[in-house]
């Protein structure tokens, strides 16, 4: 049984300009004291074409963590535009929150992110070279995708077989029925969105 359950994630300052920091309010619960730190990361997917464009925006160690419910705000700087392919700067991508214990990832929360120009002229006639200062970031906060992995929480047991499952306790938070629609300015097709998110949610 997992010793840590993520109860809720709230996306703060959303939507916001591209260069604003990412901010997530994370609430989690430990069923018993943890002797080692939890490592949290925020990862920005720079391109659906290759993971080489993924950027770890920040990582933080939390712990040792006593049993009980805990909440903290995880903030990370915006991604480095120089590491994002021009073709992927505008449109839909993904941001991930991961947590590991003893070097083993046990939960991954993924959100769709839409980067678009707020000015009509720029939307209709986008510059060849993206102008990140004019982009607005909008995280689809209502529809995260959560994947959990079985890990070895103890020192004296063999490593468990890796597996993943949706967290039933977060069903209201994790509904994947609704995806971004073109009517809301999310122009990427549902199929390509699913492929992009699945590829990052299923890897360890």
Curated annotation (Swiss-Prot):
Result of changing residue 94 to R: Abrogates interaction with histone H3 and histone H4. Loss of interaction with TLK2. Reduced phosphorylation
UniProt keyword list: Chaperone, Chromatin regulator, Chromosome, DNA damage, Nucleus, Phosphoprotein, Transcription, Transcription regulation
Phenotypic consequence of residue 175 to A: Does not affect phosphorylation in response to DNA damage
Record Pfam families: ASF1_hist_chap (PF04729)
Result when mutating residue 37 to A: Abrogates interaction with CHAF1B and HIRA
GO aspect biological process, one term: DNA replication-dependent chromatin assembly
Main localization, broad class: nucleus
UniProt-annotated stretches for the region Interaction with histone H3, CHAF1B, and HIRA: 1-156
Tissue-by-tissue expression: Ubiquitously expressed.
Molecular-function GO terms, alphabetical: chromatin binding; histone binding; histone chaperone activity
Domain of life: Eukaryota
Motif Required for interaction with HIRA, residue numbers: 31-37
Region (Required for interaction with HIRA): 155-204
Modification after translation, per record: Phosphorylated by TLK1 and TLK2. Highly phosphorylated in S-phase and at lower levels in M-phase. TLK2-mediated phosphorylation at Ser-192 prevents proteasome-dependent degradation. Phosphorylation at Ser-192 by PRKDC in response to DNA damage promotes the histone chaperone activity and ability to replace histones at double-strand breaks (DSBs) at stalled or collapsed replication forks, leading to RAD51 recruitment.
Family: Belongs to the ASF1 family.
Subunit structure: Interacts with histone H3 (via C-terminus), including histone H3.1, H3.2 and H3.3, and histone H4; the interaction with H3 is direct. Probably interacts with the heterodimeric form of H3-H4 taking the place of the second dimer. Interacts with the CHAF1A, CHAF1B and RBBP4 subunits of the CAF-1 complex. Interacts with CABIN1, HAT1, HIRA, NASP, TAF1 and UBN1. Found in a soluble complex with NASP and histones H3 and H4; the interaction with NASP is probably indirect and mediated by H3-H4. Interacts with CDAN1. Found in a cytosolic complex with IPO4 and histones H3 and H4. Interacts with CREBBP.
Full protein name: Histone chaperone ASF1A
Lineage: Eukaryota, Metazoa, Chordata, Craniata, Vertebrata
